[in-house]
Amino acid sequence: MPVTHIISSIAPLECEGDVLSVNDLHFSYPDGHVALNGVSLKLCEGDKVALVGPNGAGKSTLMLHLNGILGGKGEVEIAGKKLTRENLPAIRAMVGLVFQNPDDQLFSPTVFEDVAFGPLHMGLPEEEVRMR
């Protein structure tokens, strides 16, 4: 059964140059689980936001859409740039991401894994990262 939460019944204030805009975002996992069902939101510069909810509510799934790790139906726009395959590197350069399991990035077993974490996750081949 889907969970629906009303975040605010107050109409959002207009702002110049939205920092983040999500419009009618939908995403289902391969097993059929609907994680996002028509999510829309707009954040302006300086907004402070908390995204809370129970396990499985779609919080992490939404975050993974904000820098193109997952793709669904709908539109995501970051600082005026639509999230498309063509401008994905530019979007990822503006959006930081910390994974849920801090052991995946904070405590690397080797110096190479620590230093290479960013370049590898931005799509550089391991051979090129090792040469640099």
List the model feature ranges, each with a label.
Residues 67:
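Helix-to-loop junction immediately C-terminal to a conserved catalytic motif
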Residues 9-22, 26-38, 50, 85-87, ...:
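A short, flexible loop at the N-terminus of ABC-type nucleotide-binding domains that lies
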Residues 72-84, 91:
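Conserved ABC transporter NBD signature motif
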Residues 52-54:
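The feature captures the beta-strand-to-loop junction immediately N-terminal to the Walker
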Residues 57:
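ATP-binding Walker
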Residues 60-61:
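Conserved Walker
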Residues 103, 109-120, 130:
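Short helical segment in ABC ATPase nucleotide-binding domains corresponding to the A-loop/adjacent helical element
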